[in-house]
Regions:
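N-terminal anchoring/stem segment of glycosyltransferases
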Residues: 1-67, 155, 159, 172-174, ...
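Short catalytic/ligand-binding loop motif for oxyanion handling, primarily in non-cytosolic enzymes
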Residues: 14-15, 46-49, 79-82, 86-88, ...
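Short, surface-exposed amphipathic charged segments that create phosphate/polyanion-binding patches used
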Residues: 54-56, 107-113, 193-200
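Conserved catalytic core of nucleotide-sugar-dependent glycosyltransferases
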Residues: 84-153
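Catalytic core and acceptor-binding pocket of nucleotide-sugar-dependent glycosyltransferases
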Residues: 126-213
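A short, hydrophobic secondary-structure junction motif
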Residues: 27-38, 119-134, 168-171
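A structural signal for short, well-ordered beta-strand segments and their strand-loop junctions
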Residues: 5-6, 39-41, 71-74, 94-96, ...
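GT-A fold catalytic core of metal-dependent nucleotide-sugar glycosyltransferases
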Residues: 52-109
Length: 213
């Protein structure tokens, strides 16, 4: 089985600057530990966050044609030394569902997704998939058809957000998917600030990389 872990980084946020080498080494060492190729993309034709987020889905589609298992992790995701082999734990399209409530920053994503589905006469859930960590393969990306359905998503919601769009597509077209356990996308933010042993991959939303487990 061929495997790849890929990520991408642009210096759009100076909070990363002094930790770039540390993060890359942690991600690369995790990939090598479990026999996966590691790829860090630094696209020079992208200069904004939205295009960077779109690019990771397009890259996943490309890699799914070349590798049996594809894992994307944001560059603010740091694997812990005790993290087991994720490739033995997940399969197909696997993402972590968040359940934002009113007043939370993520809540607006949920509302956009629900409005898109409602406009198509579809039922909807109360979650949004976080794409900071996701696993996929050729079959799951072929079913998702993200690139093919991008124009449809933009017509329904011109304000681009990759998590809104991918959540809409999964629900609208009933794409097969799996829920990624929280331990693989252990989000650190204003609610959970300090990394701990519960997480295998610590996702530093708050960018406080000096906080280590």
């Amino acid at each position: 089985m061929t495997k790849i872990i890929f990520t991408q980084y642009l210096p759009l946020n100076d909070q990363f600057e002094e930790y770039v080498d540390y993060i890359e080494n942690k991600q690369r060492n995790y990939a090598l530990k479990y026999g996966a190729t590691y790829a860090l993309h630094t696209p020079d034709d992208i200069d904004n966050y939205d295009d960077l987020q779109l690019n990771k889905i397009l890259l996943a589609e490309k890699y799914a044609e070349q590798y049996d298992q594809v894992l994307y992790i944001d560059f603010d995701v740091i694997p812990t030394d005790h993290a087991p082999n994720i490739f033995e734990k997940v399969n197909g399209l696997s993402l972590y569902p968040t359940y934002p409530k009113a007043g939370m920053k993520e809540y607006y994503k949920l509302i956009d997704k629900q409005m898109m589905l409602a406009s198509e006469g579809c039922e909807y859930t109360d979650n949004i998939f976080n794409t900071g960590v996701f696993h996929c393969d050729k079959a799951s990306m072929a079913e998702l058809k993200f690139s093919e359905r991008l124009d449809e998503c933009r017509e329904l919601c011109p304000k681009f957000n990759n998590e809104v769009y991918i959540s809409y597509i999964i629900e609208r077209y009933k794409c097969k998917h799996n829920f990624l356990s929280m331990c693989w996308n252990f989000i650190l933010d204003g609610y959970q600030e300090i990394p701990n042993a519960s997480g295998y991959f610590h996702h530093y939303h708050h960018k406080k990389f000096h906080l280590r487990y």
